[in-house]
């Protein structure tokens, strides 16, 4: 009875019932709330009450005036351990108080209702910022978690925000799965939690208290043992739901204006060897219902632009079960692929990069030396040479090492480039050494994550590595950023940058990290494009700049990267002779602009909706004879185009009217149609039309071919308008 009272007080509907004006009606059976839900909530309430008392005592003992620096130089006074960011937002404007989702205090993300402790720089985050969206969607995942615990008796595993929404992984037992028919009920319960405007309450708990709170959740216990390295960690309460989370979160669930659950699927805990199969439900949410409607309209447009659909309709590529995780590029798709690679090769030549070719198959000794065998082994394909009878590594007494005869397909090029740098003595006069490689890579992604061109087992990258002196680092980073801007502007992408700094378990000297992060930050500030700071999100071997490009529908994609590496030069003992004659260690920069060429091609297909710009297009020109009598001349025109290296087709189906054939060419997204009749044949000319049905009139054949070549070489996005 006590649980039911708490349930009603917190705004939850009683399980299995719905309220009616005249009577209560039994719905389809819903699992009784698990016993641990009330036990955990009771312990949370005890710990929360104790924390409130500690905070009140702290306020009395340490209350003092502190200075808060706001953006644009404004400063205000506040009371330590008392004033919250939300209270300051109310003082500034009611609009800010209503739209802020979290705060940033001295670079740290902060709950709006968490008291400020000392002098600080304060910035408010709204849904419009990437950080604000992450907070908003993380809180939405917690709402879904509360609904899943209530309705399904779920054991929660993880519920992160993503670049395009959120998802929740949870366990229902070995036999139970989530059905798509259950999503509307889950969504309704989420909406009831939102309507109740339940507060998110932040609690700091000791490791012992954490174990007690989550004693019935072995997933959380595993995370506590593995990830909680300090004496305390944070949990958040939302209604009766309690979850382990760093936060921050929204002030209350009522800030979520609209929430929609999208898909249900299965997921794995940790690895394919784990016995538990998790259930995953993904969703999206917004501060206002209007934003959800706009998103749904964009989603419908995105479905029409799905690269898998375009690839099939335009005969660009296909997939086959006999080669999972790999793409078969047909002639038209190969044309686009090669044009992208040629574009990057031209930039390499202009920017002083040297293209190299390295093997695909290496002894695992290389990967042990680089550290990938220890940290990345689960994502690598390994095999034994024919005729060897070595013991499988999984059966040996040393699982971290592999027998001498074991080989592995390379998942990245950097170790091979280190071998290439080290194969002969180097001088400071050679630096920087910029090595570029389009070598085939293989990564063993989980089969469930494979989908179209976005995630493959076999792919190629515009992968390059720069070996430079520390004094050259700043100039090289500026060059990498300029490379990004040049390529993305041609491809029609806007982009956002994020600087990820040292994580807790970083390797190397702190002063080297300080210097490198300072160089990256200064380069970003001078670059002038939008960027944000991701504290602690760098790789263990160096800070990085992540590049998030935005396509024509405004969707983010992470493709390019600029990564500093302090460890590989040490692991491979890379040296060059410095100006004083002493050996010195180079700095290594990993960088990619397109990232996976396959993935970028898929992003481009969806961004342009299959209407390829001329320089990429596999449908540059179709030649259409008016009558059968002009078919020979039409073939002559086609041969002239092909001789110039342009892509051309011939539509000599004179059984259809001219207007039907022109319309067919426009629907197929041919950039240009060259219509040839008796007059054009006599004048050695063509009548030019565009895919947007602009009639450009009669032009000389040689002149038209030359103009197409000029527009193709310039890589303009609007050749039809400039012709």
From Swiss-Prot:
EC assignment: 6.1.1.3
Biological processes per GO annotation: threonyl-tRNA aminoacylation
Enzyme class: ligase
Keyword Transit peptide appears in the UniProt entry: yes
Gene Ontology CC terms: mitochondrial matrix; mitochondrion
Residue stretches making up the TGS domain: 64-126
Cystine crosslinks: none
Reaction equations catalysed: tRNA(Thr) + L-threonine + ATP = L-threonyl-tRNA(Thr) + AMP + diphosphate + H(+)
Domain of life per record: Eukaryota
Cellular location(s): Mitochondrion matrix
Key words, A-Z: Aminoacyl-tRNA synthetase, ATP-binding, Ligase, Mitochondrion, Nucleotide-binding, Phosphoprotein, Protein biosynthesis, Transit peptide
Gene Ontology molecular functions: aminoacyl-tRNA deacylase activity; ATP binding; protein homodimerization activity; threonine-tRNA ligase activity
Modified sites of kind Phosphoserine: 57
Similarity comment: Belongs to the class-II aminoacyl-tRNA synthetase family.
Function recorded in the entry: Catalyzes the attachment of threonine to tRNA(Thr) in a two-step reaction: threonine is first activated by ATP to form Thr-AMP and then transferred to the acceptor end of tRNA(Thr). Also edits incorrectly charged tRNA(Thr) via its editing domain.
Subunit description: Homodimer.
Protein name as annotated: Threonine--tRNA ligase, mitochondrial
Organism: Rattus norvegicus
Gene that encodes the chain: Tars2
């Amino acid at each position: 009875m006590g649980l039911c009272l708490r349930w009603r007080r917190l705004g939850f509907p009683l399980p299995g019932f719905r309220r009616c004006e005249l009577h209560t009606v039994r719905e389809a059976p819903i699992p009784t709330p698990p016993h641990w839900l009330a036990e955990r909530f009771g312990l949370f309430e005890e710990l929360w009450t104790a924390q409130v008392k500690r905070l009140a005592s702290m306020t009395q003992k340490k209350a003092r005036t502190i200075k808060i620096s706001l953006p644009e130089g404004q400063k205000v006074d506040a009371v330590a351990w008392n004033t919250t960011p939300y209270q300051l937002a109310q003082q500034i404007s009611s609009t800010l108080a209503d739209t802020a989702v979290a705060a940033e205090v001295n670079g740290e993300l902060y709950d709006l209702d968490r008291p400020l402790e000392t002098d600080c720089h304060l910035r408010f985050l709204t849904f419009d910022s990437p950080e604000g969206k992450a907070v908003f969607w993380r809180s939405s995942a917690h709402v879904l978690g509360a609904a899943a615990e209530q309705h399904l008796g779920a054991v929660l595993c993880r519920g992160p925000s993503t670049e395009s929404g959120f998802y929740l992984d949870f366990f229902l037992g070995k036999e139970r799965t989530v059905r798509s028919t259950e999503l509307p009920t889950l969504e309704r319960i989420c909406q009831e939690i939102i309507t109740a405007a339940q507060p998110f309450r932040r609690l700091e708990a000791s490791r012992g208290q954490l174990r007690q709170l989550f004693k019935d959740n072995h997933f959380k216990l595993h995370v506590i043992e593995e990830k909680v390295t300090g004496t305390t960690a944070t949990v958040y309460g939302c209604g009766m739901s309690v979850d382990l989370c760093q936060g921050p979160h929204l002030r209350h669930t009522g800030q979520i204006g609209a929430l929609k659950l999208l898909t249900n699927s299965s997921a794995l805990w940790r690895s394919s060897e784990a016995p538990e199969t998790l259930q995953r439900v993904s969703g999206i949410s917004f501060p206002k219902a209007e934003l959800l409607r706009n998103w749904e309209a964009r989603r419908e447009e995105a479905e029409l632009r799905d690269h898998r659909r375009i690839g099939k309709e335009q005969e660009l590529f296909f997939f086959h079960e006999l080669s999972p995780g790999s793409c078969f590029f047909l002639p038209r798709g190969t044309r686009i692929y090669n044009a992208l690679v040629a574009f990057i090769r031209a930039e390499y030549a202009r920017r002083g990069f040297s293209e190299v070719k390295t093997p695909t198959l290496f002894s695992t000794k290389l990967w042990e030396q680089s550290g990938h065998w220890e940290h990345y082994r689960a994502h690598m394909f390994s095999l034994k040479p024919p005729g060897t009878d070595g013991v499988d590594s999984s059966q040996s007494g040393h699982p971290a090492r592999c027998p001498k005869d074991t080989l592995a397909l390379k998942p990245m090029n950097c170790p091979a480039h280190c071998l290439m740098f080290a194969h002969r003595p180097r001088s400071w006069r050679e630096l920087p050494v910029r090595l570029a490689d389009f070598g085939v890579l293989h990564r063993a992604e989980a089969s469930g994550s494979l989908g179209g061109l976005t995630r493959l087992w076999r792919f190629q990258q515009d992968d390059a590595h720069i070996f430079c002196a520390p004094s050259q680092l700043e100039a090289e980073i500026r060059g990498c950023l300029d490379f990004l801007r040049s390529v993305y502007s041609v491809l029609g992408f806007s982009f956002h940058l994020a600087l990820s700094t040292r994580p807790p378990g970083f390797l190397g000297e702190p002063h080297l990290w300080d210097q490198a992060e300072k160089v990256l930050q200064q380069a970003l500030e001078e670059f002038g494009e939008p960027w944000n700071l991701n504290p602690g999100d760098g790789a263990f071997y160096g800070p990085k700049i992540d590049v998030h490009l935005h396509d024509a529908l405004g969707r983010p994609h992470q493709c390019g990267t600029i990564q500093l590496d302090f460890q590989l030069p040490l692991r491979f003992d890379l040296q060059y002779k410095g100006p004083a004659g002493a050996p010195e260690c180079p700095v290594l920069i990993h960088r990619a602009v397109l990232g996976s060429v396959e993935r970028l091609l898929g992003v481009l297909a969806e961004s342009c909706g299959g209407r390829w710009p001329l320089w990429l297009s596999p449908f540059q020109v179709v030649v259409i004879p008016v009558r059968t009598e002009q078919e020979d001349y039409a073939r002559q025109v086609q041969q002239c185009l092909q001789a110039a290296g342009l892509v051309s087709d011939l539509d000599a189906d004179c059984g259809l009217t001219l207007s039907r054939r022109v319309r067919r060419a426009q629907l197929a997204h041919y950039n240009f149609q060259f219509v040839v009749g008796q007059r054009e044949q006599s004048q050695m000319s063509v009548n030019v039309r565009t895919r947007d049905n602009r009639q450009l009139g009669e032009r000389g054949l040689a002149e038209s071919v030359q103009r197409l070549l000029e527009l193709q070489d310039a890589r303009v996005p609007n050749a039809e308008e400039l012709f």
